[in-house]
Amino acid sequence: MKQREPGRRKSDHTNVKDQYDEVQRDGRYEEGMARMAVYHRHCQDPVIFKVLGDVRGKSLLDLACGDGFYTRRFRSLCGASPVMGIDLSPKQIERAQMIERQQPLGIEYRVGDVTALALDRHFEVVTAIHLLHYLENATEIELVLRKIYGVLDHRGRFVTMIANPEFDFARHDAADSKSKFAYYFSRAEPGNGGLMRFHPGGFDKERELTVEFRRWERHVLDRIADDVGFTPEWHDPFISAEGLERYGASFFDNYLANPQSKLLCLSKLIEPRNKP
């Protein structure tokens, strides 16, 4: 299939910022995250924390951190330190900072656009639970990966969840996904840069959230990562032992056969092969 370089919808990503500001302001973000607890705990968390590994005492930067849902866990459960979270949405960061004041963990939060990432420090680990699929083209992906490469310490790692390159919309059971995991897709164009329309939170139609992002094919991301100076490694999601015991293996059959996301771990080489 011919590769296509989709045009930007809004080059400064104000659409994404405005949307996440709105859902944080009206409470749907927090409510939706709570509704998706089964998915997060049993489908997404296991692969994230397995690949993240032992980060006790390691500096960690969490990009696209939202209200700090994972940022706090990387600090409190995994022992990463120091920890910083950055997000494009001021309202998300306001919420993260409020929680930090109420339950201090020593996390620093900042509003920022990863495409203009500029920090005066380095980190041993960079995470981004959902980021790359919000970018609009290969040029932007390369820019962001170079920014991340620049803030990583020697042989640091970038751990990120990304829209599944092999997701098959024809096999997607929307009703099953919504009833069990509080999300579904209403659109997923095939091919590199194909638009995906995602509805998280399990809301009724009148309150439904609609999030659009793009799928990027595996070989495209691998090539860009390699050009920047990363070694890419893909990981499939798997179900937690607790989830299997509580719900049974068949409960997760549809999800595992066609998961919404996969994990990409990029390990930094000593020097980038092709500097910009």
Where are these regions (language model features)?
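A short SAM/SAH-binding and catalytic strip from SAM-dependent methyltransferases
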Residues: 124-139
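C-terminal lobe and adjacent flexible extensions of AdoMet/dcAdoMet transferase-like proteins
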Residues: 220, 224-276
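A short acidic, Gly/Pro-enriched loop at the edge of an enzyme's catalytic core
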Residues: 115-126
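Conserved class I S-adenosyl-L-methionine
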Residues: 2-55, 69-73
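A short glycine-rich, Lys/Arg-flanked "PGG" loop and its adjoining helix->strand segment in the class I
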Residues: 142-154
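SAM-dependent methyltransferase
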Residues: 159-223
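Residues at the starts of beta-strands that form the adenosine-phosphate
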Residues: 59, 82, 157, 231
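Class I SAM-dependent methyltransferase SAM/SAH-binding core
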Residues: 61, 67-116
